[in-house]
Amino acid sequence: MIIRPVQLADAAAIRAIYQPYVTETAITFEVDVPTVPEFERRITKTLAQYPYLVAEVGGKVLGYAYASSYYARAAYDWTTELSIYVAKEARGQGIGSALYTALEEELQARGYLRFLACIAVPNEASIAMHEKRGYVQVAHFPRIGYKFDQWHDIVWMQKTIDWPVNTLKEVEEKR
């Protein structure tokens, strides 16, 4: 398995991984599958500030993970939300864990200290993976998203890195 930075050429593979999450699950609250050009736009926007990684096995992209802004205020500059998606046929093979490890390491190198995951529940596999990685549940929002003719809850999980906070200037220099 190779974990590498995303390329715009990966957009079609990423869309193929994401499509069943949109059309078959409430794991994402997105209801329409984005186009390849939309994924290219999202990749470009994410890479302007955050890491975006893919897992490749035998030349095929089987998963991806990226970070995004938790909230657009300066006081949150040490906090980021992580997202991960693994192809159906590749789940349970360690791809998600490898992606998360690489993403967390990159984020720490850039000065981020708080990692958040927003998880639609029920999703025992995602919650177990996050707990194994040191995340704890910090919030539960009942009936907050409506998809497939029913309401769905979300939970927020957080992992805290106990490093000293750098000045904003030091953090910006690492990014």
Q: What spans do the regions from the language model cover?
A:
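Conserved active-site tyrosine of GNAT-family acetyltransferases
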Residues: Y18, G59, H130, Y135, ...
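A short beta-loop-alpha structural element at the N-terminal edge
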Residues: I2-A16
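Conserved GNAT acetyl-CoA-binding A-motif
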Residues: L107-I119
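Glycine-rich phosphate/pyrophosphate-binding loop shared by adenosine-nucleotide-utilizing enzymes
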Residues: M1, K60-Y64, H152
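Conserved catalytic-core motifs of GNAT/GCN5-like acyltransferases
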Residues: Y66-S69, L116-I119, E131, V136-D153, ...
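Acetyl-CoA-dependent GNAT
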Residues: V31-E89, Y100-T101, T160-D162
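Conserved beta-strand-loop-alpha-helix junction that forms the acyl-donor binding cleft
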Residues: R91, A117-I127
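Conserved acetyl-CoA-binding loop-helix of GNAT-fold acetyltransferases
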Residues: G92-E105, A128-K132
